[in-house]
Design a protein with these regions (language model features):
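Conserved SAM/SAH cofactor-binding pocket of Class I
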Residues: 57-148, 154
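Short loop/edge segments at beta-strand edges and connector loops
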Residues: 43, 123-125, 195-197
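Class I SAM-dependent transferase core
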Residues: 2-68, 72, 105, 109-119, ...
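Helix-to-beta-strand junctions that scaffold the AdoMet/dcAdoMet cofactor pocket
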Residues: 89, 161-163
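Short alpha-helix immediately C-terminal to the canonical SAM-binding loop
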Residues: 103-105, 175, 179
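Conserved beta-strand signature within the Rossmann-like core of class I S-adenosyl-L-methionine
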Residues: 164-174
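Short "lid" loop at the C-terminus of a central beta-strand within the Rossmann-like core
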Residues: 127, 172-176, 201
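SAM/dcSAM-binding transferase cores
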Residues: 180-237
């Protein structure tokens, strides 16, 4: 994993030798399970290090992941960004949410094989789990790398946050347009865009843009959110 070590050092992200070893185990598990269930189209080691692992670890540049905060990762898939964040700082208390049970099975094996504590994977849809008292308004940070519009992600994620908690959305170059289209959602869900961190990642001469939107919850979520998927599709915020 020398490639990952050099990539992270360039961004001043420090990983322990143990963390680097666990990233290698994690990578092999992804490749093994990718033959059974669809986890990622990126299977080349160098590309995985750049487009998955480093990309997720850029979240640590916010300075928000250096203690024992409670973190929820919505639509976690193969565990991105939850597992890389946990390997960066094992003190984080992380919950991973995904709607596909096969991925939950995979994530539980990752947790076991990497010997991770204070991290769990739960099966469910965000718009349903977000209405449950045990999860609602109970996290310091919610992250999502899911491919969905910002307004949709806001309705899926903001209900999970404590007041003054932060939602971190990972977006590509068209984020300004998404923010503009999400003004109504931001207002109705009692949150505001606090900051945007911009990064450029290079791999084999190809440069990709990554933007981390930091959105703060400034008031309690109204009881009617999140709505069911039928309502969300019929009338998006």
């Amino acid at each position: 994993m020398d490639n990952l070590k050099s990539l992270t050092q360039k961004e001043n992200i420090i990983l322990s030798d143990i963390a680097l070893e666990k990233f290698e185990i994690y990578r092999k598990l992804i490749l093994e399970w990718n033959e059974k269930i669809n986890l990622t189209a990126i299977t080349d080691e160098e590309a995985m290090n750049t487009k998955h692992f480093l990309d997720c670890l850029l979240l640590t540049k916010t300075g928000l992941f250096d203690d024992d905060k409670t973190v929820l990762d919505v639509g976690t898939g193969a565990g991105f960004p939850a597992i890389p964040l946990k390997l960066y700082n094992e003190n984080l208390k992380i919950t991973m949410l995904d709607s596909l049970n096969k991925r939950i099975k995979f994530l539980n094996i990752v947790i076991e094989d990497l010997n991770l504590k204070n991290i769990k994977a739960i099966h469910g849809r965000a718009e349903e789990v977000g209405r449950k008292k045990v999860f609602r308004e109970s996290f310091d940070i919610v992250s999502s790398r899911a491919v969905a519009s910002l307004s949709l992600l806001l309705e899926f994620t903001i209900p999970f946050l404590k007041v003054n908690g932060l939602f971190l959305a990972m977006k590509g170059p068209s984020y300004l347009e998404e923010v503009e289209n999400s003004k109504n959602a931001l207002k109705k869900l009692n949150c505001k865009l606090e900051n945007v961190l911009n990064f450029k990642i290079e791999q084999n001469g190809e440069i990709s843009e990554r933007n981390i939107l930091i959105i703060k919850k400034v008031g309690k979520t109204p009881n009617n959110f999140p709505r069911n998927m039928g309502q969300i599709k019929k009338k998006p915020l």
